[in-house]
Amino acid sequence: MNLWHYIAPARLRPEDFFAVIEIEKGSKNKYEMDKETGALRLDRILYTSTHYPANYGFIPRTWADDGDPLDVLVLCSECIRPLSLVECYPIGVISMEDSGSLDEKIIAIPFQDPTYNTYQDISELPNHVASEIRHFFRVYKSLEGKETVVSDVLGREEAIKIIIKCQNAYIEKYCR
């Protein structure tokens, strides 16, 4: 089953959605879902000494400006296994450019993590959490000779707008 396409739309509201985890927090392995099969494939091992600061994946039934499902970082007190479904809510978004293309990453929190589920907006997190995420995305491709530019860290309302935009883009691409 391809988790990108076969999660019921009713389970994917902008303010309450299931994220599919591709990469667990602390990993240097860059996995991506194979769009054709839905299988997880190893894209590369990060060239830098950095590791993913949060669990990383995508929101099913979305189509982002970079031609992939919308990325999501899931802040959680534990590592989450790849291909797990995690019910989350958005608290913000990091907007960046990756090789000249817009690349937005939703920041989300699992409803069932008592360490994080009191936060409703990225502005409520300790400053260091957002700084660590920004730093990771600034440097994680540098030794590959690729440039990334982190431009904005925006709150929950902007994240919800981006999720809606990417859900609508998915409908236009795959459901019409």
Residue map of PLM features:
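Hydrophobic N-terminal alpha-helices or hydrophobic patches in metabolic proteins across all domains
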Residues: 1-176
